[in-house]
Swiss-Prot record:
<dbReference type="GO" id="GO:0006207">
    <property type="term" value="P:'de novo' pyrimidine nucleobase biosynthetic process"/>
</dbReference>
<comment type="similarity">
    <text>Belongs to the metallo-dependent hydrolases superfamily. DHOase family. Class II DHOase subfamily.</text>
</comment>
<feature type="binding site">
    <location>
        <position position="219"/>
    </location>
    <ligand>
        <name>substrate</name>
    </ligand>
</feature>
<feature type="binding site">
    <location>
        <position position="16"/>
    </location>
    <ligand>
        <name>Zn(2+) 1</name>
    </ligand>
</feature>
<keyword id="KW-0862">Zinc</keyword>
<feature type="binding site">
    <location>
        <position position="14"/>
    </location>
    <ligand>
        <name>Zn(2+) 1</name>
    </ligand>
</feature>
<feature type="binding site">
    <location>
        <position position="136"/>
    </location>
    <ligand>
        <name>Zn(2+) 2</name>
    </ligand>
</feature>
<feature type="binding site">
    <location>
        <position position="247"/>
    </location>
    <ligand>
        <name>Zn(2+) 1</name>
    </ligand>
</feature>
<dbReference type="InterPro" id="IPR002195">
    <property type="entry name" value="Dihydroorotase_CS"/>
</dbReference>
<keyword id="KW-0479">Metal-binding</keyword>
<feature type="binding site">
    <location>
        <position position="42"/>
    </location>
    <ligand>
        <name>substrate</name>
    </ligand>
</feature>
<comment type="function">
    <text>Catalyzes the reversible cyclization of carbamoyl aspartate to dihydroorotate.</text>
</comment>
<feature type="binding site">
    <location>
        <begin position="16"/>
        <end position="18"/>
    </location>
    <ligand>
        <name>substrate</name>
    </ligand>
</feature>
<dbReference type="GO" id="GO:0004151">
    <property type="term" value="F:dihydroorotase activity"/>
</dbReference>
<feature type="binding site">
    <location>
        <position position="263"/>
    </location>
    <ligand>
        <name>substrate</name>
    </ligand>
</feature>
<feature type="binding site">
    <location>
        <position position="251"/>
    </location>
    <ligand>
        <name>substrate</name>
    </ligand>
</feature>
<feature type="active site">
    <location>
        <position position="247"/>
    </location>
</feature>
Amino acid sequence: MTDTLTITRPDDWHLHVRDGAALEAVVPHSARQFGRALVMPNLRPPVTTAAQAVAYRDRIRAAVPPGTAFEPVMSLYLTDKLPPEEIALAAEAGVRALKLYPAGATTNSDAGVTDIRHTYKTLEAMQKHGLLLLVHGEVTDPAVDLFDREAVFIDRVMIPLRRDFPELKVVFEHLTTQEGAHYVRDANRFTAATITAHHLLYNRNAIFTGGIRPHYYCLPVLKRETHRVALVQAATSGSDRFFLGTDSAPHPAHLKEHALGCAGCYTALTAIELYAEAFDSVDALDKLEGFASFHGPDFYGLPRNSGTITLKRESWTVPETVPYGDATLKPLRGGETVHWKLM
């Protein structure tokens, strides 16, 4: 049994850090363990121009603790009306991707895409300039059951999108289903996916055990056990199609514990420890470095990190709350035990 594990410094390819005092509170949590993070653009208002992305990047960099090597990788928010001309400016500014949110699918997605066909000229420009498309893979059709939204998205959006843009690099974000895992596994080399720690560790029972547990509520929502098992199999398979993306999504505790609670699990505080626990549960720690440190930068066409981190098999208690501007934030598994610790 391995009691210590040293891996190349990992990256987080799906992270929410918000803005202002909230940003200042959470960025250090990610910076202590990751070399880079792909930052989501769903602010209010959303990040839709290269100039906005550069300004946001500067604010994130300013929140990184001195002496810590952490670089935000920026994305734009794709809308029906985002002009193709903005793509060249984005590429020049170092923006790496655009995020497709179906309108109304998740937090701050009101300005999202209503019909993927409205964005085709912009997608053509992205394919030309080498920017990636990151998709929140759910339909928002009210006739589709909440737990089926990902599978229906594959049929209605992903398959036509891949047919029309075969060489556009697409990341299926935060996979939650067996259908999604198999789709990415069997797709062409321009398709990959991120998987969260909470979708590897928990199924939908976690939301309801002993009462409503709002800190396990996220979108896409946790699914049944068969899907969790399929995600673990994908993540630990060694396939370079799958890589780490926490989708860590901070919300003040009082807005999670609310009649209309916000969707999102805050995992950035303990992210790499939670992933280690998930991989250890199926005796696959030897596959963690590829998933966490290699597959993401390889797909994005970026160099791998040169530093390392070390994890130790040690049980410790996650803080119940952490400061979050004028509020508090409850991390996933707050007050409970995690069985690996970042040294």
